[in-house]
């Protein structure tokens, strides 16, 4: 009107899955009046005459020009896009005159659809609810029809790990770019980030790979004793440019993450960054919570959202109730308790996400202390990821209208292994019903594992403990004889036994008879085994549900009267 664009914006937010009647009226001398369900919700005064658009299409539910989303944090790394209305539009009327409030009220009386929702609640898909058989399976998780229809995938796009002792899951879903999530029994999603680096075009990370063009997941092992899942991705920006491309080879930064997951809800994250500059500035961990539409960070997190602990059992809990925790220094780092290496997120759930790194890796922790929006949430809150397809490097969430995420912290710790072209780091992670201080025995058993002593050592090699698998490594130089093998785990308070795994290489295709301190498990719950094919033969994987600070004897013999598997 009058050669200028005008707009009226309401302060009222529309709730999800409810019908609203929206009317916009323009009248010279009055200007714009915006009505929501018959009530004035916004105005813009103007005396100018209305000027209809010429030579332009009439669009309903879509903007006519591309623009960056409102709330964009880094415009240089965010593309301009068309914005669409996500919902149902019905009974659209365009008048050639200004209508008054009485006419709007009459219309509402005649056509009021009521409060019944015709749209289903959108929940992040995590597979079957509740307890399931421990194991991993391929599937294509369903979110909602319009979102699912965008994908060029068939029936085996995602991976879900189920547990039989608690109702949690471990999920690799394309809607999160396959970034794996621990999902609690009541549907709270948590992840430990990925590797991330930066350039003048923005963040390079799998979060940018909205279509999963380089992010892939596959099941490596799947047996009653453990699950191994391999996730591989390139470090991409939002325009699918890979970081640090070598001018000679054409290779950029790639990452392999291998997750070894056990029935007790504990997994090892072994993450290897391959690069021609393997020690550039990079992140390897961030405590991230993911929410579905209708959820806010406050719905899934306690205000006292994070507890850190050290190997002495000292703990400290950090609160966001009054803003960034006051314990954070000028750079965001926290120093209580001293030498903390255990990280527990206080989700509103019985089982909570945890992280453990070795105390010998010199860990340091910081609080995510920027991009907060006081008055919107006490926690950082963004919705440029997950499930969004547009290239966007960061967008503040203003409302819970779509899937979103929040972050609490970062861990910085030393590498477990380095080569001229790679860096590997390790962490324990999973879900637990325990407090942070009560995770110390688990941390000790992994960081300072009990010594394994062979009792029957003929044709047997003891290859020690591999923290990247949370497993002892034994190799047979000959096929197992009738006497099998026997060993001791020498647990003590400094090196306790906690649900050990034993890998017996070259065991062969023979069902084992396993005894712990002379007792055989009759339930199949406390002693589990599986097999793994390898280049050298068939390996046996044994997992024992056992906590002890004393010596434990384990024997593994070929079962009599039972055929090979």
Which positions does each model-derived feature cover?
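Acidic (Asp/Glu-rich), glycine- and aromatic
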Residues: 266-310
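Extended, loop-rich substrate-binding clefts of extracytoplasmic carbohydrate-active enzymes
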Residues: 201-270
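Beta-strand-rich recognition/accessory modules
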Residues: 134-146, 338-457, 534-552, 556-558
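Beta-strand-rich N-terminal accessory domains
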Residues: 118-196, 341-371
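Extracellular glycan-associated modules
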Residues: 1-118
């Amino acid at each position: 009107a009058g050669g200028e664009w005008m707009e009226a914006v309401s302060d009222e937010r529309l709730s999800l899955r409810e019908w609203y009647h929206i009317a916009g009226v323009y009248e010279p001398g009055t200007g714009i009046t915006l009505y929501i369900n018959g009530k004035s919700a916004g105005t813009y005064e103007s005396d100018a005459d209305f000027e209809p658009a010429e030579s332009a299409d009439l669009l309903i539910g879509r903007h006519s020009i591309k623009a960056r989303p409102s709330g964009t944090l880094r415009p240089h790394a965010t593309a301009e896009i068309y914005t669409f209305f996500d919902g149902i539009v019905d009974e659209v009327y365009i008048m050639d005159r200004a209508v008054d409030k009485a006419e709007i009220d009459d219309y509402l009386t005649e056509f009021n659809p009521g409060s019944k929702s015709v749209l289903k609640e959108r929940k992040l898909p995590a597979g079957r609810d509740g307890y399931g058989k421990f194991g991993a399976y391929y599937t294509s998780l369903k979110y909602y029809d319009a979102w699912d229809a965008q994908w060029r995938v068939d029936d085996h796009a995602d991976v879900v790990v189920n547990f039989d002792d608690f109702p949690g899951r471990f999920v690799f879903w394309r809607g999160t770019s396959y970034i794996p999530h621990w999902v609690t029994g009541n549907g709270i999603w948590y992840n430990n980030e990925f590797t991330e680096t930066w350039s003048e075009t923005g963040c390079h990370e799998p979060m940018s790979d909205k279509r999963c063009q380089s992010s892939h997941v596959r099941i490596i092992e799947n047996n009653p004793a453990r699950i191994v899942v391999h996730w591989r991705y390139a470090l991409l920006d939002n325009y699918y440019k890979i970081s640090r491309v070598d001018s000679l080879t054409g290779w950029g930064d790639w990452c392999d993450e291998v997750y070894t997951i056990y029935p007790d809800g504990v997994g090892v994250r072994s993450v290897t960054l391959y690069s021609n500059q393997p020690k550039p500035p990079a992140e390897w961990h961030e405590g991230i919570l993911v929410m579905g539409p209708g959820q806010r960070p406050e719905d899934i997190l306690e205000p006292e959202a994070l507890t850190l602990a050290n190997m002495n059992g000292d703990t400290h809990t950090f609160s966001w109730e009054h803003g960034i925790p006051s314990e954070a220094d000028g750079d965001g780092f926290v120093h209580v308790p001293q030498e903390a290496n255990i990280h527990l997120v206080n989700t509103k759930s019985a089982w909570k996400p945890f992280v453990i790194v070795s105390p010998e890796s010199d860990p340091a922790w910081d609080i995510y202390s920027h991009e907060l929006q006081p008055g919107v949430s006490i926690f950082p809150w963004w919705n440029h990821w997950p499930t969004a397809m547009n290239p966007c490097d960061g967008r503040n969430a203003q409302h819970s209208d779509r899937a979103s995420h929040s972050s609490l912290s970062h861990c910085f710790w030393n590498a477990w292994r380095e080569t001229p072209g790679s860096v590997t780091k390790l962490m324990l992670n999973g879900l637990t019903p325990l407090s942070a201080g009560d995770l110390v025995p688990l941390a000790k058993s992994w960081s300072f594992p009990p010594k394994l002593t062979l009792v029957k050592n003929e044709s047997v090699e003891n290859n020690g403990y591999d923290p990247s698998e949370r497993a002892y490594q034994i190799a047979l130089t000959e096929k197992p004889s009738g006497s099998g093998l026997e060993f001791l785990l020498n647990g003590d308070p400094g090196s306790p036994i906690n649900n050990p795994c034993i890998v017996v290489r070259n065991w062969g295709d023979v069902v084992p008879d396993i005894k712990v301190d002379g007792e055989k498990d009759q339930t199949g719950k406390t002693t589990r085994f599986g097999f793994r094919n390898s280049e050298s033969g068939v390996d046996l994987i044994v997992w024992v549900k056992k906590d002890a600070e004393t010596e434990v004897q384990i024997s593994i013999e070929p079962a009599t009267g039972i055929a090979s598997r």
